Design a protein with these regions (language model features):
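Short, surface-exposed linear motifs at loops/turns and structural transition points
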Residues: 16-115
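Sec-dependent N-terminal signal peptides
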Residues: 4-14
C-alpha cells in the first residue's frame, strides 16, 4: 500500500508541475515602401515582411500582402492583395483617377493581424 501511495503522489506532483518551457515570442516586422510608378489608375507597391519567431510553431493559414483604401489606415476589411514572400511587390490596377489611396503591408494568422 505504501508503494501505491508513493506512486500516486509522484504522478500527482509530476502532473501538477508548472513546467511550460520557454514562452512563444512572435514578432513580425512589416515595412511598406512609398508607391512607385504611379499613374492615374495604377501604382507599384513594395514592402518587406520579416517574421521573428522563437519557441513557436509556424502558423498555418497565414495571409499576407498589401491592403489599400482611401482612408489613412486601411485594414483587411478594405481592399487586399495577397502576396507571399519576404520582399513583396505587386501592381495595383484599375484605381479611380484623381483619388488618393493609402497602402500598408499586412500579415494575418492565429497570432493576430499585423500592419
Amino acid at each position: 500500500m505504501k508503494k501505491l501511495t508513493y506512486l500516486f503522489l509522484t504522478i500527482l506532483i509530476i502532473a501538477c508541475s508548472d513546467d511550460e518551457g520557454n514562452p512563444c515570442v512572435y514578432s513580425p516586422t512589416l515595412v511598406t515602401d512609398a508607391a512607385t510608378n504611379v499613374t492615374e489608375t495604377t501604382a507599384a507597391l513594395n514592402g518587406v515582411i520579416n517574421i521573428v519567431s522563437e519557441n513557436c510553431d509556424n502558423p498555418n493559414n497565414t495571409e499576407q500582402g498589401f491592403v489599400y483604401a482611401t482612408n489613412t489606415q486601411p485594414t483587411t476589411a478594405n481592399n487586399k492583395v495577397n502576396v507571399n514572400g519576404t520582399d513583396i511587390n505587386t501592381t495595383l490596377e484599375n484605381l479611380e483617377p484623381n483619388t488618393t489611396y493609402y497602402t500598408r503591408t499586412f500579415l494575418t494568422n492565429v497570432f493576430g493581424e499585423f500592419y
